[in-house]
C-alpha cells in the first residue's frame, strides 16, 4: 500500500516562499530508507503531529511536519538546521 498525501495549496505556496522547500519535494522524504520519524508533542494540539527528517529526491536534508490519518497531511517542510543535521548524522543507522 502506498502512502497518499494531501495539503492546503495556499499553505504549500507560502511554505515554499518562506522555506524554499515545496511539498512535492517534501513527500519524497518518505521514500528515504534512512529517514527518522518522531512525535511532535510541542506542536500537537487536538491532533497528533509527527516529524520526519530525511533526504529528499533533491538530496536536501528536510524536516517535514505532518499528521497521519487515512492520508498523510503535510503541515510544513523546511531544510534541516545545522544542529538537526548533526543530530541526524550522528544517529542515522542506529
Label each residue range with its predicted role.
Residues 1-94:
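Ribonuclease/tRNase effector modules and their secretory precursors
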Amino acid at each position: 500500500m502506498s502512502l497518499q498525501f494531501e495539503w492546503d495549496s495556499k499553505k504549500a505556496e507560502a511554505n515554499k516562499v518562506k522555506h524554499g522547500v515545496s511539498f512535492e519535494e517534501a513527500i519524497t522524504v518518505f521514500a528515504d530508507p534512512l529517514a527518522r520519524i518522531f512525535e511532535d508533542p510541542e506542536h500537537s494540539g487536538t491532533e497528533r503531529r509527527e516529524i520526519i527528517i530525511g533526504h529528499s529526491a533533491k538530496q536536501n536534508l528536510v524536516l517535514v511536519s505532518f499528521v497521519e490519518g487515512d492520508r498523510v497531511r503535510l503541515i510544513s517542510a523546511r531544510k534541516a538546521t545545522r544542529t538537526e543535521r548533526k543530530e541526524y548524522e550522528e544517529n542515522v543507522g542506529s
